[in-house]
Each structure stands twice: as structure tokens, then as C-alpha cells.
UniProtKB/Swiss-Prot annotation:
This is Small ribosomal subunit protein bS18. Pfam families: Ribosomal_S18. Keywords: Ribonucleoprotein, Ribosomal protein, RNA-binding, rRNA-binding. Part of the 30S ribosomal subunit. Forms a tight heterodimer with protein bS6. One of its GO terms (biological process) is translation. It comes from the Bacteria. GO terms for molecular function: small ribosomal subunit rRNA binding; structural constituent of ribosome. Belongs to the bacterial ribosomal protein bS18 family. GO terms for cellular component: cytosolic small ribosomal subunit.
Amino acid sequence: MAAKPFFRRRKVCPFSGENAPKIDYKDTRLLQRYISERGKIVPSRITAVSAKKQRELARAIKRARFLALLPYAVK
């Protein structure tokens, strides 16, 4: 009898749905969840964010960095 292949459950985008949070450059607490300890933007394959929302998220993070709400790099 062969073993069943391992099935990894597909993650759902945290920004899709009715009561999903809006991506806003002023919401630094939300944006910090999608930045690594070194200050880099975490890729969507790890965070399970859809491609469209990942672009919005990256734009919001870059805007917040430009306005000095978020750091560019962490020491």
C-alpha cells in the first residue's frame, strides 16, 4: 500500500474578504508584519498575499519609508 502524498493547504490572502484590513501607508503596525527583521519586504509566497495586494503592500511600505514612518534598514 503506497503512502498518501503530503497535501499542503493553500493559504488565503489576508487582505481579501469582507472584513479584511485596508492597506494604508499610515498603518505602520500592519505594515511591520510584512517586513523582515532586517527591514526587507517579505515575499508573497511566505505571507500568502495575492499578487495585486502584494504590489499595494510594497507601494505602501515604500511610501511609509519615504515619509520616515518605517526604517529602510534595521541594524
